[in-house]
């Protein structure tokens, strides 16, 4: 029985903590959702532009190094 309790105790603690976290969480209101969506959109745009410019710079460098076969 002692082994069973030792293996079940962490599972019980995890379940208890998960339920507590789930009850504490709330859905964002419309304004908060818009802020999060805008921040995500700006992040995606910045990362896209960085990737585009890195690619734009590396294509000519790669052609010079390879020799334009």
From Swiss-Prot:
Keywords: Endoplasmic reticulum, Membrane, Protein transport, Translocation, Transmembrane, Transmembrane helix, Transport. Residues 62-69 are extracellular. GO terms for biological process: post-translational protein targeting to membrane, translocation. The chain crosses the membrane at residues 41-61. GO terms for molecular function: protein transmembrane transporter activity. The keyword Chaperone does not apply. InterPro entries: Prot_translocase_SecE_dom_sf (IPR023391), Translocase_Sec61-g (IPR008158), Translocase_SecE/Sec61-g (IPR001901). It is found in: Endoplasmic reticulum membrane. Pfam families: SecE (PF00584). Signal peptide: none annotated. It is a single-pass membrane protein. GO terms for cellular component: Ssh1 translocon complex. Residues 1-40 are cytoplasmic. Its main location: endoplasmic reticulum. Heterotrimeric complex composed of SEC61-alpha, SEC61-beta and SEC61-gamma. Necessary for protein translocation in the endoplasmic reticulum. PANTHER family: SEC61 GAMMA SUBUNIT (PTHR12309). Belongs to the SecE/SEC61-gamma family. This is Protein transport protein Sec61 subunit gamma. It comes from Dictyostelium discoideum.
């Amino acid at each position: 029985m002692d082994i069973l309790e030792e293996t079940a105790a962490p599972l019980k603690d995890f379940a208890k903590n998960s339920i507590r976290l789930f009850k504490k969480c709330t859905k964002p209101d419309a304004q908060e959702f818009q802020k999060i969506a805008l921040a995500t959109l700006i992040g995606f745009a910045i990362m896209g532009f960085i990737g585009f410019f890195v690619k734009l710079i590396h294509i000519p460098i790669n052609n010079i190094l390879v020799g334009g076969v």
